[in-house]
Amino acid sequence: MRVKRAVHAKKKRKKYLKAAKGYRGALSRRYKLAKQMYVRSKWYSYVGRKQKKRDMRKLWITRINIAARNEGLKYSELIHGLKLAGVSINRKMLSELAVNDPEAFKEYVKIAKEALAS
């Protein structure tokens, strides 16, 4: 018996065209191009989720470095001093303290300086 694929094929094409709504020009109207762009967009979103983690860590380190230099320490010295002192605080929390609670951040800098001195 012959299998007619019209219903399934139309459903499949419709899925990609619906997902490609908002793309410019032929990318939202032609099935082949819409499918290619849909696959590419999924790849970009996958890569973007990985890059987001890198970018956030860079931002935290930059913020910590600026705040630490205002207190007379480099970022690397601060992290090393905190490790020597046995303080386990992650970069995200340090960054939050540097921005929102400078007094608490100064306490961590003081702890790091004491650990480096001894």
Curated annotation (Swiss-Prot):
Which Gene Ontology terms cover its molecular function?
A: rRNA binding; structural constituent of ribosome
GO process annotations (BP)? ribosomal large subunit assembly; translation
Which controlled-vocabulary keywords does the entry list? Ribonucleoprotein, Ribosomal protein, RNA-binding, rRNA-binding
Q: Cross-referenced InterPro entries, in alphabetical order?
A: Ribosomal_bL20, RIBOSOMAL_L20_CS, Ribosomal_protein_bL20_C
Recorded GO CC terms: ribonucleoprotein complex; ribosome
One Pfam family cited in the UniProt record for this chain: Ribosomal_L20
Name the domain of life this protein comes from: Bacteria
Role of this protein: Binds directly to 23S ribosomal RNA and is necessary for the in vitro assembly process of the 50S ribosomal subunit. It is not involved in the protein synthesizing functions of that subunit.
Give the family from UniProt: Belongs to the bacterial ribosomal protein bL20 family.
What name does the UniProt record give this protein?
Large ribosomal subunit protein bL20
Q: Which organism is it from?
A: Thermotoga sp. (strain RQ2)
The protein's gene is named rplT
